Amino acid sequence: MFTIAANWEGSTNYVATVEKHKPLESQGISLTYANVLNKYIESPKWESRESGNIGYVDVSGTIKGSNKKIGVKIKVSPMSNDSKRVSIKPESITLNGNSPSTQAAAEQILLYMFLADQRGEADVAYYFD
């Protein structure tokens, strides 16, 4: 559900690419990663790194309304059949420094956050209690 191809245009600014990405647009939700993560993570720190031709964006901070630390890892990889497009998908989520989640769990957590934002919820701290 979160594996979506985006126009790449040859850029390597992984943070800007992920921030602008609307992973649920095909389902009528036009929120970007920046909209959601900046809303629910206190003073989020956006960082990127590369491993070969794959980029990773790490977003970390404290969940608003909570004292829990969160780390979101998003993978940006080239599409094998189209050099102008990339696949952007959640890799894992870490809470309070515990072991990273599975990709499926990361997708579920992010889906919940996107839907909460669409409903206008001020915070999602209760979800992580």
Regions found by a protein language model. Name each.
Residues M1-D129:
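Cystatin/cathelin-like cysteine-protease inhibitor module
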